[in-house]
Amino acid sequence: MEIKGFSFSAVEAGIRYQDRLDLGLIYSDHPVVAAGALTTSLVKAAPVLIDIDRLEDGCAQAILVNSGCANACTGEAGMEVAFVTGELLAKELEIKPENILLSSTGVIGEPLNVRAFRDNISPLVQGLAPDNFEKVAQAIMTTDTVQKVCYHSVEIDGVDVHFMGMAKGAGMIMPNMATMLSFVITDAQIGSAQLKEALTPAVKKTFNRITVDGDTSTNDMVLVMANGGAQNSSIKSGTQAAEDFQGALQYVLMDLALKIVADGEGASKMITIRVCGAREDAEAEQVARTVANSSLVKTAFFGEDANWGRILAAMGRAGVPFDPYQVDISFGDVTLVRDGLAVGRSAEDTATAILKEKEITVCIDLKSGKCCEEVYTCDFSIDYVKINADYRS
């Protein structure tokens, strides 16, 4: 798929890695509507701080992204380098620096090498082409083992609207947009306020429902650019068109979010924690998230041990009131716990077979209300420890 008016490029800049793409560019041939959801961590990387300011007017023309260095916890020097990289690109593209969104991912606390940008901005711009989307997806990878892209089309008011999305992330994943990056482009005609209205709930139901290790990055961001090329009637708030657009955007973000979980560092299984019977959605989510972030639960899944006691124990510290002797817990369609008590050894043996699968659903019924939520996670393997122990070496 290609979206007319957008082009892409990626080069090997040697920022940290050798012989691999690590500097990417997404470019629109004219300023377009833009919106973002950025990390809510108090510790924010330089590009995040800059983008928060630049997104205020809801307009952008380019996204410049690098991997290998997060440019986080680098002080005023890091801010200055970030501004310089944008100015270098603006000069080469002959556009306003304020219309360039910046993004970085990689090691925290190390200075970003501005020379890598000075030497490579020109070839980066020269390499712009409408079919280089997946090269940028490769350039943003760090500990990812696969690139993550999604292509989607939907009919809005009788017009085909197209979406192209990419993401990176495998570790330091528990986004709270508010390390994980996602960029989506679309040819939908939509205002900046309406784009933000669609993005906020879509992120809440997708990227903010995943966790690999419970850590929130300094650099988390989702950026969306819409150029209006589909020439649909401009999408208005509260209309069917707005609902259709949000649904399509949420589809793309969910596809990318689940790919991040499936590619979690060292992961061998993707796990859905579904909590029902809660009094409120927030309580259901909190219980699900607490279980999903439990290291003991995640290692039990890796060991293919149907240790439901760890799940119930994690639920008990979620800060949500419930009666333990009303809780049911199932792995897939196998009930292990009914009214807070073990069903029996034969049920555990059957559940153990389910744990050998690559995708597992844990169903928890609190029997306190009618609200349900899901959180998506993965297991903790020996490789997770190795990957993170060796990350900077």
From Swiss-Prot:
Enzyme class per UniProt: transferase
Active-site residues, as the UniProt record annotates them: T179
InterPro entries found in the cross-reference section: Arg_biosynth_ArgJ (IPR002813), ArgJ-like_dom_sf (IPR016117), ArgJ_beta_C (IPR042195)
Pathway: Amino-acid biosynthesis; L-arginine biosynthesis; L-ornithine and N-acetyl-L-glutamate from L-glutamate and N(2)-acetyl-L-ornithine (cyclic): step 1/1; Amino-acid biosynthesis; L-arginine biosynthesis; N(2)-acetyl-L-ornithine from L-glutamate: step 1/4
Location relative to the cell: Cytoplasm
Any one GO biological process: L-arginine biosynthetic process
PANTHER family to which the protein is assigned, alphabetical: ARGININE BIOSYNTHESIS BIFUNCTIONAL PROTEIN ARGJ (PTHR23100), ARGININE BIOSYNTHESIS BIFUNCTIONAL PROTEIN ARGJ, MITOCHONDRIAL (PTHR23100:SF0)
UniProt record similarity statement: Belongs to the ArgJ family.
Self-association state and partner proteins as the record states: Heterotetramer of two alpha and two beta chains.
Role according to the record: Catalyzes two activities which are involved in the cyclic version of arginine biosynthesis: the synthesis of N-acetylglutamate from glutamate and acetyl-CoA as the acetyl donor, and of ornithine by transacetylation between N(2)-acetylornithine and glutamate.
Name listed for the protein in its UniProt record: Arginine biosynthesis bifunctional protein ArgJ
Organism name: Desulfotalea psychrophila (strain LSv54 / DSM 12343)
